[in-house]
Amino acid sequence: MPHVVIEYARALEHEFSIAEVMEVAFAACARSSVMQPADIKVRAMPFDHVRLEGGVTTFVHVTVSLLAGRAPAQKEHLANLIRQDLARNFPVVESISVDIRDMDPVAYKKRLLKPVLEDAH
């Protein structure tokens, strides 16, 4: 945690690498001072079928889920960083949006397996 989920129009895969989009989003989150880089998890999901108004055909929407407790100004700063960096690096994307969400710490549950380290002998 935090989780950064990038939704995008699959047509963008012909314009640039989605891995680059993930790196730009990660870097913006890392320098935001809202979270630690080691905690950031980024994933991307393409959409084949998209209906947008006004002739818009490409989009990137980023949802960042954080445990509750950040100030509104921190969340606004994070959203602006992500949006600005994506717009600067991927100017062909017609619609870029960011949503920062609070996760309920009582309801959020996680299971994490620790890697097994082999005996050095």
Regions found by a protein language model. Name each.
Residues 5-7, 16, 38-63:
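Short edge beta-strands and adjacent turn/loop segments
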Residues 11, 46-50, 102-106:
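Short, internal active-site loops enriched in acidic
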Residues 19-25, 77-82:
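Short amphipathic alpha-helices in soluble, non-transmembrane regions
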Residues 24, 28-41:
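Short, well-structured hydrophobic secondary-structure segments
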Residues 36-44, 94-99:
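Short beta-strand elements
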Residues 52-90:
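Mid-chain, well-packed structural core segment of small domains
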Residues 84-109:
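C-terminal structural segments of small proteins and small subunits
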Residues 109-121:
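Short, low-complexity, polybasic intrinsically disordered segments
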